[in-house]
């Protein structure tokens, strides 16, 4: 797959939908409003502390993804990158749940973008922004 297009290329089969849905359900059950106990659950603790706590974790995990990818560039085992991406996804799923969203919302957005060049999409966004600015009095 090229970096500027989301056109499908022979990719390995992905069987993550069920796992993501199960994890999303667990995260949802750990919300304080659903009885999540911050003393017994890491997810409940992050959600109880509020957005600053889980957003900080997302930033940390994103940095760890970058560092792991750089390590792979220098010969490290790629499984470390997978491990760090899993942490990033997990904490991102906590944010999604907090804001009333689910992995299915992200999948729907990726499907919407499928087959669209990133360059074309960026140009369209700029065009729409320009039109909105011109429409303002």
Curated annotation (Swiss-Prot):
It catalyses: 1-(5-phospho-beta-D-ribosyl)-ATP + H2O = 1-(5-phospho-beta-D-ribosyl)-5'-AMP + diphosphate + H(+). Its EC number is 3.6.1.31. Pathway: Amino-acid biosynthesis; L-histidine biosynthesis; L-histidine from 5-phospho-alpha-D-ribose 1-diphosphate: step 2/9. One of its GO terms (molecular function) is ATP binding. It is found in: Cytoplasm. This is Phosphoribosyl-ATP pyrophosphatase. CDD domains: NTP-PPase_HisIE_like. Keywords: Amino-acid biosynthesis, ATP-binding, Cytoplasm, Histidine biosynthesis, Hydrolase, Nucleotide-binding. InterPro entries: HisE, PRib-ATP_PPHydrolase-like. GO terms for cellular component: cytoplasm. Residues 114-124 have a biased composition (Basic and acidic residues). Disulfide bonds: none annotated. It comes from Paracidovorax citrulli (strain AAC00-1). GO terms for biological process: L-histidine biosynthetic process. Belongs to the PRA-PH family. The lineage of its organism: Bacteria, Pseudomonadati, Pseudomonadota, Betaproteobacteria, Burkholderiales. Coiled coil: none annotated. Residues 114-137 are annotated as: Disordered.
């Amino acid at each position: 797959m090229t970096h500027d297009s989301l056109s499908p290329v022979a990719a390995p089969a992905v069987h993550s939908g069920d796992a993501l849905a199960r994890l999303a359900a667990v995260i949802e059950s750990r919300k304080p409003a659903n009885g999540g106990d911050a003393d017994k659950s890491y997810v409940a603790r992050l959600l109880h502390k509020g957005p600053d706590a889980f957003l900080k974790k997302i930033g940390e995990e994103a940095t760890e993804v970058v560092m792991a990818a750089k390590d792979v560039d220098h010969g490290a085992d790629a499984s470390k990158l997978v491990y760090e991406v899993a942490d990033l996804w997990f904490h991102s799923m906590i944010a999604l749940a907090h804001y009333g969203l689910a992995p299915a919302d992200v999948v729907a957005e990726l499907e919407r973008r499928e087959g669209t060049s990133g360059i074309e999409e960026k140009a369209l966004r700029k065009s729409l922004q320009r039109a909105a600015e011109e429409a303002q009095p």
